[in-house]
């Protein structure tokens, strides 16, 4: 048998970037031979084995054939006579269809095996499909978009983009399971330049199918005095990229992506104003999160950001009572860590505007000071002093928090 390192490990090595994952293909072996050497079988649809020491994945060389629509509609063939080139031919992109042999000691040996000119496409910074079999797996559209967010200086080859559009038109994207869509979107959001992912998805038409609420934002004008970039879609991409540049969490980046969804449904006769877009954003966001089965942590933060971001931008004008009501609505008193992420998302919103990425955002520090003051109130002591009257306790704690915030900020109640 012969073992080869394949795919992303070879690509990243040639690009000079850290290798994130190592995948191996075994040519000329049977499942029985693998288990005899201590490998543990874990593959469900085709033979994949874990190395007895490293726990890295080793897959038997295979070919695949489309048998039904969607991500799972494949039939796999594996046998000792399946060649390395045949295995590489089933891969999505030329830059992912390269290999190097692995010595018995685990070292990469020999030249790069590159039957589809992946090295040339790496030099040209191009995503190009290996074969027309690309159209058989709709996940590949999402993968290319995610790779674009990681390798922001790459472009999609014209012929590959044409195939992607054909797939979208044929309804292949509609067959994707929600969990896989979310998985790829989430991974793309965590890359260095998430806006590139959405640019590719828009270009091939897939964004309108998987995230129509986001796709609707392009071409919607905003007031130029607040938003020099004018276009809402452009603004949202700047917000997401700012959050990524700061290294913020997935929850913050998702909130950045969805905070202005309501602007996509603003009546044309009131543009470029967007009165009430916050509540419309919330109403659009709820079914989106349900449809894609977005994790609770991401959904909950996104809903708070969508509802409250306009209020946070205006906190310099608020009195202590309004600030305490904001803390209570956003559950900041019980969940200060989530409130810190709310601040990050709103700061990203303020700075995700043309020419304003370094603009001060004093609202964040004001809110941090105010929240610390509100949380310093000893609600238990107040309750013990009042007794069993729940409403009186609630009102007294509320008043004490207002007074604490007013004192901390030296402002009126």
UniProtKB/Swiss-Prot annotation:
Residues covered by the HD domain: 232-333
Keywords, sorted A to Z: ATP-binding, Hydrolase, Magnesium, Metal-binding, Multifunctional enzyme, Nickel, Nucleotide-binding, Nucleotidyltransferase, RNA repair, RNA-binding, Transferase, tRNA processing
Q: Which Pfam families does the annotation name?
A: HD (PF01966), PolyA_pol (PF01743), PolyA_pol_RNAbd (PF12627)
Q: What does the entry list as the binding residues for CTP? A: 8, 11, 91, 143, 146
Q: Where does Mg(2+) bind?
A: 21, 23
Q: Which residues bind ATP?
A: 8, 11, 91, 143, 146
Instruction: Read off the InterPro entries from this record.
Output: CCA_bact, HD_domain, NT_sf, PolA_pol_head_dom, PolyA_RNA-bd, tRNA_CCA-adding_enzyme
The cofactor named in the record is: Mg(2+); Ni(2+)
Q: How is the cofactor bound?
A: Magnesium is required for nucleotidyltransferase activity.
User: Which domain of life does this protein belong to?
Assistant: Bacteria
GO terms in the biological process aspect are: RNA repair; tRNA 3'-terminal CCA addition
Q: Does the keyword Hydrolase apply?
A: yes
Q: What is its EC number?
A: 2.7.7.72, 3.1.3.-, 3.1.4.-
Instruction: Recall the GO molecular function terms of this protein's record.
Output: ATP binding; CCA tRNA nucleotidyltransferase activity; cyclic-nucleotide phosphodiesterase activity; magnesium ion binding; phosphatase activity; tRNA binding
The record's catalysed reaction(s) read:
a tRNA precursor + 2 CTP + ATP = a tRNA with a 3' CCA end + 3 diphosphate; a tRNA with a 3' CCA end + 2 CTP + ATP = a tRNA with a 3' CCACCA end + 3 diphosphate
Entry keyword Transferase: yes
Entry's PROSITE patterns?
A: HD
Q: What is known of its domains?
A: Comprises two domains: an N-terminal domain containing the nucleotidyltransferase activity and a C-terminal HD domain associated with both phosphodiesterase and phosphatase activities.
Q: What does this protein do?
A: Catalyzes the addition and repair of the essential 3'-terminal CCA sequence in tRNAs without using a nucleic acid template. Adds these three nucleotides in the order of C, C, and A to the tRNA nucleotide-73, using CTP and ATP as substrates and producing inorganic pyrophosphate. tRNA 3'-terminal CCA addition is required both for tRNA processing and repair. Also involved in tRNA surveillance by mediating tandem CCA addition to generate a CCACCA at the 3' terminus of unstable tRNAs. While stable tRNAs receive only 3'-terminal CCA, unstable tRNAs are marked with CCACCA and rapidly degraded.
Subunit and interaction comment: Monomer. Can also form homodimers and oligomers.
Question: Belongs to which family?
Answer: Belongs to the tRNA nucleotidyltransferase/poly(A) polymerase family. Bacterial CCA-adding enzyme type 1 subfamily.
Q: What is this protein called?
A: Multifunctional CCA protein
> What's the source species for this entry?
Burkholderia cenocepacia (strain HI2424)
């Amino acid at each position: 048998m012969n073992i080869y390192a394949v795919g992303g490990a070879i690509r990243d090595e040639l690009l000079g970037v850290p290798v994130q994952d190592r995948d191996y293909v075994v040519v000329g072996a049977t499942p029985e031979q693998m288990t005899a050497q201590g490998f543990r079988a874990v593959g469900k649809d085709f033979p994949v084995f874990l190395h007895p020491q490293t726990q890295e994945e080793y897959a038997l060389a295979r070919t695949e054939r489309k048998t039904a629509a969607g991500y799972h509609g494949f039939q796999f063939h594996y046998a000792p006579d399946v060649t390395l080139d045949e295995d590489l031919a089933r891969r999505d992109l030329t830059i992912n269809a390269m290999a190097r042999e692995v010595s018995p000691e685990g070292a990469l040996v020999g030249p790069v095996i590159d039957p589809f000119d992946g090295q040339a496409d790496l030099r040209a910074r191009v995503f190009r499909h290996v074969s027309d079999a690309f159209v058989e797996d709709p996940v590949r559209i999402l993968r290319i978009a995610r790779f674009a967010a990681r390798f922001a200086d790459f472009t999609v080859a014209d012929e590959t983009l044409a195939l992607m559009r054909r797939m979208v038109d044929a309804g292949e994207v509609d067959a994707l399971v929600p969990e896989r869509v979310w998985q790829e979107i989430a991974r793309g959001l965590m890359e260095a330049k998430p806006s590139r992912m959405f640019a590719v998805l828009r270009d091939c038409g897939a964004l309108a199918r998987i995230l129509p609420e986001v796709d609707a934002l392009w071409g919607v004008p905003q007031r130029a005095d607040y938003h020099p970039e004018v276009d809402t879609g452009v603004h949202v991409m700047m917000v997401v990229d700012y959050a990524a540049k700061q290294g913020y969490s997935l929850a913050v980046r998702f909130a950045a992506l969805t905070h202005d969804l309501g602007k996509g449904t603003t009546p044309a006769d009131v543009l470029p104003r967007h009165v009430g877009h916050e509540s419309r954003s919330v109403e659009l966001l709820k079914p989106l999160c349900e449809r894609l089965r977005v994790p609770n942590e991401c959904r909950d933060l996104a809903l708070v950001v969508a509802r409250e971001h306009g209020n946070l931008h205006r906190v310099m004008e608020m009195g202590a009572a309004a600030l305490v009501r904001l803390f209570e609505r956003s559950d900041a008193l019980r969940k200060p860590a989530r409130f810190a992420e709310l601040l990050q998302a709103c700061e990203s919103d303020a700075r995700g505007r043309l020419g304003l990425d370094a603009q001060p955002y004093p609202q964040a520090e004001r809110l941090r000071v105010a929240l610390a003051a509100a949380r310093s109130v000893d609600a238990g002591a107040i309750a013990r002093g009042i007794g069993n009257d729940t409403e009186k306790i609630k009102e007294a704690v509320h008043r004490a928090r207002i007074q604490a915030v007013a004192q901390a900020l030296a402002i009126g109640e």
